[in-house]
Amino acid sequence: MQNNNPCGLDGFAFLEFSGPDRNKLHQQFSEMGFQAVAHHKNQDITLFKQGEIQFIVNAASHCQAEAHASTHGPGACAMGFKVKDAKAAFQHAIAHGGIAFQDAPHANHGLPAIQAIGGSVIYFVDEEHQPFSHEWNITSPEPVVGNGLTAIDHLTHNVYRGNMDKWASFYASIFNFQEIRFFNIKGKMTGLVSRALGSPCGKIKIPLNESKDDLSQIEEFLHEYHGEGIQHIALNTNDIYKTVNGLRKQGVKFLDVPDTYYEMINDRLPWHKEPLNQLHAEKILIDGEADPKDGLLLQIFTENIFGPVFFEIIQRKGNQGFGEGNFQALFEAIERDQVRRGTLKELS
């Protein structure tokens, strides 16, 4: 393995979810275009696929997934990282501060793993080590197109105030993640700081969010989720208009965006060439730099899907940012949603 990529990282392998009601998770993923392609032979564990995305819904009892659901409610209880050599990556992780994780025997993934944020787990996956590799009953071996979601783009972690350096150090010391973006967002009433980390392979991105006050959406998440964890999951598409339209038809609800946002797009990005009426109709956000060479990014955020967790749909047209130009508009949109739900009082 290369020194700059000591664990031989090569992207996301899977995300694992658990919750008090696994039927709701199954229904939600089906509405998003995922298909159940395999079931565990002996446990209540289901594998969903769409494009290259693999979601595992783990409803087994007396295991880490159940414990995570008991603490946090529905959410992402584990993530799998693709690596060149799972055993070597695990050994490197342990030598650099990682804490080994071993699940209950009946729910063992058959993968080396370490403890991660908020009681979650990071599994190491290679060609030899696959999750529950010999325990699946395959029901659908065909590729699943679904709503055109293709891959996991990034996972955003919400952390307690004062813990950003701790988790940045965790990813840096074990995996050699580097800071690739830093944001300081101020809404009308609340604020947050975000530090985006990127893996040496360039395929894993993990922004860390930390609140600047007691009332922000980050603090609301930490309170409702009963701790730190994965706040949102960003999924790639090659045609965001088609994907979002399909998701809306299947009942997925997205954050509203003020009409004034679309009145400003041509001034912000005069070169963009996107169909403005379609952007407006689907409430899709657009971002880019002054120089067209840096490309565009199209994105949209769902409302909270289960608990305080939500999804982002993103299409990258050459831009590798996170929609920094949209953060302010999005932050204020979420503040409006907080006011509507009564968790934040509007300033008079």
UniProtKB/Swiss-Prot annotation:
Its cofactor is Fe cation. GO terms for molecular function: 4-hydroxyphenylpyruvate dioxygenase activity; metal ion binding; toxin activity. The keyword Repeat applies. Residues 11-141, 151-303 form the VOC domain. PROSITE patterns: VOC. It is an enzyme of class 1 (oxidoreductase). NCBIfam families: 4HPPD (TIGR01263). Belongs to the 4HPPD family. This is 4-hydroxyphenylpyruvate dioxygenase.
